[in-house]
């Protein structure tokens, strides 16, 4: 709901950029925070207080944070990737079982590949952005659109409440309810989340992961209907067990 992103999407829909051939999405920044375990603290309480450190709680930062950039890629390209191959690692975290960084190649088919990079390490170069290349130019997610051959793009007027897209999305939500035209983005949210999970699984295991591995029971994939433990049921019945701190997935073995 940010005006600049809407304008970029509109330009792509109008064909100004031509077919998207590739791009890169980044969320490279510093660490968030972590909580040390308290004496006598239950596994459930520790995991909840330290949720940004456990894959079972946040999905790892490729899912919890970098998903925003991955979502832009899916939105602009108009489809989900067919497969992913990635890697990652852990260098500075002290608690939990997450990686510090991920690097994933998403293949969207039709000759389009997106390089995905995310990192949570202090003292490094930071970048949070998206870049796309089409047959007729390039653009950042937030613009500007730079074309090889000029195209006259007549942008519509976009409402931007108080200059904030985070306020505007609530305006759109409430307006949809009032007007009887509710917005349902559940499919887009689910697909972007699954795209990030696909990248995470590839990085954890070191294997090529296909979209159908996660969505098609006939694929006989070990990752179909994957469920992390502990889950909601374990927290509700009091049996939640925290994974060991600083024990992480090893590619080639996970």
Predicted features, each with a name:
Residues 1-95, 104, 122-124, 128-131, ...:
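Predominantly a Rossmann-like dinucleotide-binding segment in NAD(P)-dependent oxidoreductases
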Residues 113-121:
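Flexible, glycine/threonine-enriched loop-and-boundary segments that flank and lead into catalytic domains
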Residues 109-113, 136-137:
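Glycine-centered tight beta-turn/hairpin loop motif at sheet-sheet or coil-to-beta transitions
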Residues 57, 64, 68-81, 85, ...:
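C-terminal helical cap and adjacent loop that interface with cofactors, partners, or active-site loops
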């Amino acid at each position: 709901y940010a005006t600049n992103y809407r304008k970029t999407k509109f330009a792509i829909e109008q064909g100004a950029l031509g077919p998207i051939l590739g791009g890169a999405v980044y969320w490279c920044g510093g660490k968030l925070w972590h909580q040390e375990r308290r004496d006598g603290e239950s596994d459930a309480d520790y995991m909840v207080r330290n949720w940004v450190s456990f894959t079972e709680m946040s999905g790892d930062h490729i899912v919890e944070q970098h998903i925003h950039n991955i979502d832009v890629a899916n939105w602009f390209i108009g489809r989900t990737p067919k497969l992913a191959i990635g890697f990652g690692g852990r260098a500075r975290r002290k608690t939990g079982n997450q990686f510090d960084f991920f690097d994933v190649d998403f293949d969207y088919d039709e000759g389009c590949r997106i390089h995905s990079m995310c990192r949570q390490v202090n003292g490094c170069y930071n970048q949070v952005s998206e870049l796309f290349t089409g047959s007729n130019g390039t653009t950042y997610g937030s613009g500007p659109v730079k074309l090889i051959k000029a195209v006259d793009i007549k942008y519509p007027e976009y409402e931007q409440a108080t200059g904030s897209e985070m306020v505007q999305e609530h305006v759109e939500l409430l307006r949809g309810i009032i007007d009887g035209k509710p917005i349902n983005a559940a499919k887009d949210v689910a697909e972007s989340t699954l795209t990030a999970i696909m990248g995470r699984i590839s990085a954890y295991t070191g294997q090529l992961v296909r979209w159908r591995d996660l969505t098609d029971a006939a694929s006989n994939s070990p990752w179909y209907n994957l469920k992390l433990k502990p889950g909601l049921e374990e927290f509700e019945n009091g049996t939640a067990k925290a994974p060991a701190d600083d024990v992480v997935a090893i590619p080639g073995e996970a």
